[in-house]
């Protein structure tokens, strides 16, 4: 039984040039941050409204699935708590930047 040597078929990993070329102006970065923040707040609002609708529907007897209502309410609660914690971290970071001496 002969064993032949396999060639070196592994090519080295090349750096992704598009990652290195991502340079944004401050206004582009601010616009990106603002749109991300706006989308997160809109998502939170949508989740809160969905939870309210399901809770009202359950209370009025339109739906009987308590499990789904509780999952939606918990999802809403966790999302709100996460948003509040992120807000606190952003404010802390802003205050830290304002304390820096130039």
Swiss-Prot record:
Q: Which residues cross the membrane?
A: none
Sorted UniProt keywords = Bacterial flagellum
Source species: Oceanobacillus iheyensis (strain DSM 14371 / CIP 107618 / JCM 11309 / KCTC 3954 / HTE831)
Q: Which GO terms describe its biological process?
A: bacterial-type flagellum-dependent cell motility
- Entry-linked NCBIfam families: fliE
**Gene name of this polypeptide:** fliE
The family database entries (HAMAP family) matched by this protein are listed as: FliE
For this record, the Gene Ontology CC terms, alphabetical, are: bacterial-type flagellum basal body
State where the protein is found: Bacterial flagellum basal body
* UniProt xrefs under Pfam families: FliE (PF02049)
Q: What is this protein called?
A: Flagellar hook-basal body complex protein FliE
Its lineage opens with:
Bacteria, Bacillati, Bacillota, Bacilli, Bacillales
Family recorded in the similarity comment:
Belongs to the FliE family.
Single GO molecular-function term? cytoskeletal motor activity
Q: Does the keyword Membrane apply?
A: no
Q: Which residues form a coiled coil?
A: none
Q: Does the keyword Disulfide bond apply?
A: no
């Amino acid at each position: 039984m002969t064993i032949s040597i396999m060639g070196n078929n592994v090519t080295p990993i090349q750096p992704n040039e598009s990652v290195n070329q991502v340079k944004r102006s401050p206004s582009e970065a601010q616009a990106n941050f603002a749109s991300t923040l706006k989308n997160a707040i809109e998502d939170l609002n949508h989740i809160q409204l969905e939870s309210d609708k399901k809770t009202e529907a359950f209370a009025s007897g339109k739906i009987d699935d308590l499990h789904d209502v509780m999952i939606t309410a918990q999802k809403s609660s966790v999302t709100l708590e996460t948003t509040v914690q992120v807000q606190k971290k952003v404010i802390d970071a802003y205050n830290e930047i304002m304390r820096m001496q130039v």
